[in-house]
Amino acid sequence: MFLPIKSDNGAVLPWEYMPAEAGTYKAGQLLAVDATTGQVEAITADLTTTPPYLCMADITVETAGTPIPVTRVSRDYIYETTLAEAATGAVVGTKLQVEAGGLMASKPATGSGTFEVVALDGTAAGDAVRGRWV
């Protein structure tokens, strides 16, 4: 899960309620927006761009369109998550991608993502990593 840890300006992230596609969501899960319905949904593939929303509760949506609590992903915050797999060679400044499901980060096989590492506990799967969106 992606947890907001620290802000540049000391402000608290405001919550919004956005309509969601049917499904089960977890607090700290990054979400995309369905281009057809405009509702938030789980990320279904690895993502090298910045997702727009972060879910703020464990919730199951039975009926599409039910609002769920989210915050907008902010470039002014540092977030903490875990590595989905070993990220050999990752150092401060490495840009990671969001794994499918929106709960962890990984080092892309080619290119770079938009989650820039600011601190690492290690580079093994499951190690904590902190970063900001660039």
Model-derived features: where do they sit?
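Surface-exposed, low-hydrophobicity beta-strand/loop segments enriched in small/polar/acidic residues
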Residues: 1-134
